[in-house]
Amino acid sequence: MLQKTNRDSQEALQWLSRFLHLDHRRGKEQLSVAGTKDKRAVTVQKVSLQRGRKTLDEVWRMVNHIGQPVSSAPGTRERRTVELATTTRAERGLRIAQLAYADAPLQLGMLAGNQFTITLRNVHWDNEAERLSDKDRSQLSEALEKRVTEIQKDGFVNYFGMQRFGTGAVSTHVIGIAILRGDFNEALRLLLSPEDREDERDESTAPPHVVATRAGRKAYAEGRYEDAHRLFPKICVAERAVLDKMRMPHWHPSDALGAFQNIPRSLRLMYVHAYQSYLWNSLVSERIRRFGAFRCVPGDHVAELDAALDASTAVTVAGEDAETKHSIEEVVMPMPGGDVILPASGWMADMYSELLAKDGLTPSMLSTSRQPEYRLKGSYRRIVQKPRNARCELIPYEDADAPLCETDEEKLLPDVHLSPRAPLDAPFLALQLVFQLPPSSYATILLRELLRMDTSAHTQKELTKNSADQKVASTHSAPAPP
């Protein structure tokens, strides 16, 4: 099991590859996971390693740097011990535990679902005072519990979340369009363009990674690929992988495909799958606009609730008795691809053709790429999803920086514990939500439906920046380290 903190999945696997001294090229394939996890979170998941002759003990010691200097400072003699590794937080925000042998590696999709614990701070009624009375708190708690009950009963529209489309200046699905067109020069341009679109702050106020990214883009634009590779921060996994190929003496600008193919395979496929997700979201929005999200209607595609959804799933078209025969949970929307048949006529066929034409694509181009790995087979996805075992709790707190949820790593460490709960009349309230979702369903979409507010990263950053608890924290504490 791997716990990662504030780490992108690809970046975390790259660090593990380095710790385990895996081959620079093959390391991408020797570590595998069943699914990617959010970056800005503490996440726990299984990771499989093609270990060669390494034992479990050797793997654990290598990842925990047993016997290595505890500091990179010159003259350091102290070495990292097993005791130190089991009593202090793991380095790089990566903790491994519960190692075991397995007969086969993990593959994408080999998971039943995900459990989330999400804590939202400084909760209050919209457009009301942030300091709530006891009566207001009681009413807020009742309202939230009612909303959780409703969303468990009725579900939420199962959109792909914004993280599916990336947080960069160019959405991942736009790069996917270039790939499906076979235009890898355009894909590289979109990925490495030097335009300062991602952050308009000047260098005195922009975060270090933004400044470094700008410098890397500028070096790329000037043809200084070695410098660009060095300047791009390690979180820019795709950009650095492309530049790693470009900086080689034998690479030629005509080989845009070769440079792009140097990106880890799972990341490359993310771009075309993002476009597939964009199409699906668009089609579902139109279906909901026409017919709502609470009933099955004639013409809907339906699949049994326990069916594993892929291109071979047995799907039927609902007839005139749709509303009485099928629940909204059975309704699925095709994920466009070569192995999925979409209606030949009607609103869905018209909209699908219009979306593709706008992007310079045809239906056949989604499944006939010269690169087989980019050929989309298609699948089905339920348009409404219901969370399982959902519950909520309002937690009073005083310190904006105090943890309100214990991580798995903290449960293992003997001297790390949550602080005692704040008194009930503490100035601030946090909402803690716990729920389970099937694979590929997005917690951010559930939150948007539950709270009826914008859950985009930009909006949430602004809310945090301007919240009352942060203002109190800024007057009592020193600036956080970079």
Question: Could you say what each language-model-derived stretch is?
Answer:
Residues 1-482:
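Non-catalytic, substrate/partner-engaging modules appended to enzymatic cores
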